[in-house]
């Protein structure tokens, strides 16, 4: 019986865990500012520490990283004796370099509070090797493809003898293939697969199976995933032993499941293309307090490269801007990402879907989607970069008035409701839009290199728009080309198939002598002028024999297909004629039976379609990766 007046311990208090955490872990968590466990931490940590395999499904910002790092560290520090040299005790597998780097960063922040491990984190001198120690400690090694070579990774492994590896699948597999790296049953304790669904989406299934094959079956395994799809289920069956499934849901206002944390507000703003960037600037300047970390999403890598210098020219001075996309070299991606994370003043990350999942960037206050993603599943993961770990966050998507408004009920069906943005109240005028476009266009006119980037970026954007999975909502045929061209601060619309039949002004009313439009780079400009002079003196164009032969080949191929199309048309006409003759010979009773069968078939098709839509709604959006 409880003593009267005795306070009941909060089940989400860190010191309420059983088995209890080490004092230094509690100190580390307190210094990180985490007063209480999140529901996923309270559910996962005791089970994972208590020798259970776990499959964890939870929304974004739910604290999954600490849910596996704390049990992994505790397991390694509760061994009876230190592991032998070059023996690995734990492995954490991540789908991307950025996420692996994040996990390693959180781990090192944790280990700074454990004195023996903190000492082991200090870099060794040239030629020095890690001395064996009788004290238990955690020595991590981060393995990333594209930043170091496999030989350098192995050399570092042999020098430091780490007992915990954090890696992307390919680089991990290369290291495990070395005869100098040992993961025997006597040493290996735990495997963590973070973002398991993302690992499989990126095609790492074969690598994962090979990794599992190199590890002892008697081990603890934790699988952390946004959704447990059939493919993830297969990994569960092969790699886990009687796992406990933990699914943490968030309830919406109507009592149904929501795919986002309660601290995240997801809104939309209806705005024509030319008003998108004025609306963005208005949002950044009106939000109170000023967002410290913001993420702006664009559709393509080329668009990020084009808009970065334009936004730098028009953004308020207090905001820094960093770009990140999948076509950046690995060292540039890593440098830019680190710069963004470490920024102490308000900073914006201009990016593509490379930053839509897995990145646990602290203090992201605002996410703005200038372009809706081609894949509706990604919408959730973009939003989920804000509002993490209970912190308030705002996500805003810009939609064009008209057909794009259908995206709102489309998301509602998928349990992802978005509401109109009411605070701050954003209103933009045509005059403000003209002034901003003029400033951006001034940048474009200052360097022909930006003109080239704009042409490529606009074409890539149109291609991305045309491939949207919600193709009935996002239709190229509905686009206002003049408004779009001005919104992009273009000085010419590019040549592309979509504009062949368009009769508008492709110069957008800009008078420009293209022959005098120069590159800032003197070498490029000199090369352009030389090429221009050569073309002027070259005389009339005469095709080569090879070009003539290719043209004939294309014409022959085209004629062949025309004949095939004609035959197909004749067959279709004959088929329709036979069907009409068959129906004419039928009695009224037979016709009624035929119509009944046709209706039954149509009903069946509709049922299947409806079931597929419902299944898609359940499967596509089952939460976020952390």
UniProtKB/Swiss-Prot annotation:
The UniProt GO MF terms for this protein read: ATP binding; ATP hydrolysis activity; RNA binding; RNA helicase activity
Role: ATP-binding RNA helicase involved in the biogenesis of 60S ribosomal subunits. Binds 90S pre-ribosomal particles and dissociates from pre-60S ribosomal particles after processing of 27SB pre-rRNA. Required for the normal formation of 18S rRNA through the processing of pre-rRNAs at sites A0, A1 and A2, and the normal formation of 25S and 5.8S rRNAs through the processing of pre-rRNAs at sites C1 and C2.
Sorted alphabetically, which SUPFAM superfamilies does this protein's record hold? P-loop containing nucleoside triphosphate hydrolases
Query: Which positions are tagged coiled coil?
Result: 558-620
Q: How does it assemble?
A: Component of pre-60S ribosomal complexes.
Q: What is this protein called?
A: ATP-dependent rRNA helicase spb4
Where, by residue number, is the motif Q motif? 14-42
> Which spans are transmembrane here?
none
Print the organism lineage. Answer: Eukaryota, Fungi, Dikarya, Ascomycota, Pezizomycotina
Name the keywords, alphabetized.
ATP-binding, Coiled coil, Helicase, Hydrolase, Nucleotide-binding, Nucleus, Ribosome biogenesis, RNA-binding, rRNA processing
**Entry EC no(s):** 3.6.4.13
A GO biological process this protein is involved in?
A: maturation of LSU-rRNA
């Amino acid at each position: 019986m409880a003593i009267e007046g005795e306070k009941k311990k909060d089940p989400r208090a860190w010191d309420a865990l059983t088995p209890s955490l080490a004092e230094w872990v509690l100190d580390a968590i307190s210094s990180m500012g985490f007063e209480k466990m999140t529901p996923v931490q309270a559910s996962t940590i005791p089970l994972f520490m208590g020798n259970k395999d776990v499959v964890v499904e939870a929304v974004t910002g739910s604290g999954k990283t600490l849910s596996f790092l704390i049990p992994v560290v505790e397991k390694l520090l509760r061994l009876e004796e230190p592991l032998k040299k070059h023996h690995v005790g734990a492995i954490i597998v991540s789908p991307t370099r950025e996420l692996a780097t994040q996990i390693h960063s959180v781990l090192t922040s944790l280990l700074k509070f454990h004195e023996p491990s903190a000492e082991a984190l200090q870099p060794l001198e040239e030629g020095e090797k890690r001395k064996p120690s009788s004290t238990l400690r955690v020595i991590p090694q981060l393995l990333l493809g594209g930043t170091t070579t496999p030989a350098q990774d192995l050399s570092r492994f042999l020098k430091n003898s780490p007992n915990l590896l954090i890696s992307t699948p390919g680089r991990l597999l290369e290291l495990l293939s070395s005869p100098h790296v040992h993961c025997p049953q006597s040493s290996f304790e735990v495997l963590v697969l973070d973002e398991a669904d993302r690992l499989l989406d990126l095609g790492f299934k074969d690598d994962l199976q090979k990794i599992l094959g190199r590890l002892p079956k008697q081990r603890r395994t934790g699988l952390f995933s946004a959704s447990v799809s059939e493919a993830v289920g297969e990994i569960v069956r092969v790699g886990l032993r009687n796992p406990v499934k933990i699914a943490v849901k968030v309830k919406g206002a109507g009592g149904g499941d929501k795919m986002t944390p309660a601290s995240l507000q997801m809104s939309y703003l209806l705005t024509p293309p030319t008003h998108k960037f004025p609306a963005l600037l208005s949002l950044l300047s009106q939000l109170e307090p000023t967002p410290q970390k913001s993420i702006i999403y664009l559709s393509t890598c080329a668009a990020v490269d084009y808009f970065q210098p334009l936004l730098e020219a028009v953004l308020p001075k207090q905001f820094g801007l960093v770009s990140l996309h999948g076509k950046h070299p690995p060292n540039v991606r890593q440098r830019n990402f680190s710069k963004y994370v470490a920024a102490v003043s308000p900073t914006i990350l201009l990016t593509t879907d490379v930053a839509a999942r897995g990145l646990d960037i602290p203090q992201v206050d605002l996410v703005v989607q200038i372009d809706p993603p081609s894949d509706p599943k990604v919408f959730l993961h973009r939003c989920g970069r804000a509002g993490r770990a209970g912190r308030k966050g705002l996500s805003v998507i810009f939609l064009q008035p008209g057909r794009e408004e259908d995206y709102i009920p489309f998301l509602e069906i998928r349990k992802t409701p978005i509401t109109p943005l009411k605070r701050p109240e954003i209103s933009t005028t045509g005059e403000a839009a003209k002034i901003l476009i003029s400033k951006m266009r001034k940048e474009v006119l200052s360097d022909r290199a930006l003109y080239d980037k704009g042409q490529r970026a606009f074409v890539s954007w149109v291609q991305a728009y045309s491939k949207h999975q919600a193709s009935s909502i996002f239709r190229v045929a509905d686009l206002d080309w003049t408004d779009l061209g001005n919104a992009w601060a273009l000085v010419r619309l590019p040549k592309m198939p979509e504009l062949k039949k368009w009769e508008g002004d492709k110069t957008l009313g800009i008078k420009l002598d293209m022959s005098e439009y120069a590159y800032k780079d003197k070498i490029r400009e000199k090369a352009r002028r030389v090429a221009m002079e050569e073309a002027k003196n070259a005389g009339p164009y005469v095709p080569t024999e090879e070009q003539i032969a290719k043209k004939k080949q294309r014409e022959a191929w085209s004629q062949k297909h025309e004949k095939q199309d004609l035959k197909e048309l004749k067959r279709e006409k004959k088929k329709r004629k036979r069907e009409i003759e068959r129906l004419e010979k039928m009695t009224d009773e037979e016709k009624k039976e035929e119509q009944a069968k046709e209706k039954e078939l149509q009903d069946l098709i509709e049922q299947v379609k409806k079931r597929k839509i419902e299944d898609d709604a359940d499967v596509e959006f089952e939460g976020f990766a952390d």
